[in-house]
């Protein structure tokens, strides 16, 4: 009789563990509700039509208007880029 009770309890624990694993794996990949992608400070970045270069005096030139130069690593050539939106500028934060 004692053997049957222990076997039953082991089986019950095993079923509970399997149920929890199955429940977790089903909910881990679910697409549930997400937070809205819209924020109070929305911003977009886009490339301008011009490129920029670094001169021998280490200053960047070639961008005009609201565009600024973006480059990778030590590269002396880059692309001009512009921010659009209501994101605060560095001057406003200081």
From Swiss-Prot:
S-S bridge residues: 48-67, 52-69, 63-80
GO molecular function: C-X-C chemokine binding
GO terms under cellular component: extracellular region
Keyword vocabulary terms for this entry: Disulfide bond, Glycoprotein, Secreted, Signal
Positions of glycan attachment: 74
Cellular localisation: Secreted
Record's signal peptide: 1-28
Keyword tRNA processing annotated: no
Stated role: Salivary chemokine-binding protein which binds to host chemokines CXCL1, CXCL2, CXCL3, CXCL5, CXCL6, CXCL10, CXCL12 and CXCL13.
Name this protein carries in UniProt: Evasin P1086
